[in-house]
């Protein structure tokens, strides 16, 4: 059984000098500083390229969150092709490509194609082995190409009480589904009994 949560350990027959194998996180502050230094070093090394990749606009899954858009993992092959690129070349110029994601609607497809075209219009591609001219480095692609939440257009309407109860409607629908078979059987038996009486 794996150890989880801050609970007493069951059947704790420890051996093998377990005190030496306890994982602690006293280096949390040091790791934070190390990650920051690594980011700065990477930015200097790959300059003037940005640190991150261009990500697509995707709608968050599930009913709870699907009204919001966020950055996805990568553009689909279809989006990349519609923007006039190949997946292999797109990856070399700072565009994330995801071979698993599928396009489910035209709206997001067109939005991401437009995002790719905007990126292409602003990007400066230097030769691999040529001399890189002095240009200002854009550290974050995400900051340069932000994902804005779409404005929701809503209109106020008068509240109408038609006397129906949502709870009652749901209970009736559940009841109809649950007892559909037995009710049909009873009606069928009743019709057969009446037919027998007429004979």
Swiss-Prot record:
Region of interest (Disordered), residue spans: 178-199
The protein's GO terms of the molecular function aspect are: RNA binding; structural constituent of ribosome
Q: Which domain of life is it from?
A: Eukaryota
List the keywords (alphabetical): Ribonucleoprotein, Ribosomal protein
Cellular-component GO terms for this entry: cytosolic large ribosomal subunit
Which GO terms of type biological process are on file?
translation
Q: Which InterPro entries match?
A: Ribosomal_eL13, Ribosomal_eL13_CS
Q: Which PANTHER family match?
A: 60S RIBOSOMAL PROTEIN L13, LARGE RIBOSOMAL SUBUNIT PROTEIN EL13
What does the sequence similarity comment in the record state about its family?
Belongs to the eukaryotic ribosomal protein eL13 family.
The protein's name is Large ribosomal subunit protein eL13
Gene behind this protein: RPL13
């Amino acid at each position: 059984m794996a150890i989880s949560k801050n609970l007493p350990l069951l059947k704790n027959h420890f051996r093998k000098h377990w005190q030496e194998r306890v994982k602690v996180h006293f280096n949390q502050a040091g790791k934070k500083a190390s990650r920051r230094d690594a980011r700065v070093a990477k930015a200097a090394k790959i300059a003037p390229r940005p640190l991150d990749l261009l990500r697509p606009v995707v709608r968050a899954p599930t009913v709870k969150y699907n009204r919001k858009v966020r950055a996805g993992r990568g553009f689909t092959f279809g989006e990349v092709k519609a923007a006039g690129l190949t997946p292999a070349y797109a990856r070399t110029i700072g565009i994330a490509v995801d071979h698993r994601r599928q396009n489910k609607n035209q709206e997001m497809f067109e939005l991401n194609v437009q995002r790719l075209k905007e990126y292409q219009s602003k990007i400066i591609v230097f030769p691999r082995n040529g001399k890189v001219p002095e240009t200002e480095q854009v550290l974050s692609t995400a900051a340069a190409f932000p994902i804005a939440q779409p404005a929701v257009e809503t209109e106020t309407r008068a509240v109408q009480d038609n006397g129906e109860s949502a709870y009652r409607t749901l209970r009736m629908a559940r009841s109809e589904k649950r007892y559909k078979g037995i009710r049909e059987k009873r009606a069928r038996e009743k019709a057969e009994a009446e037919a027998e009486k007429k004979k």
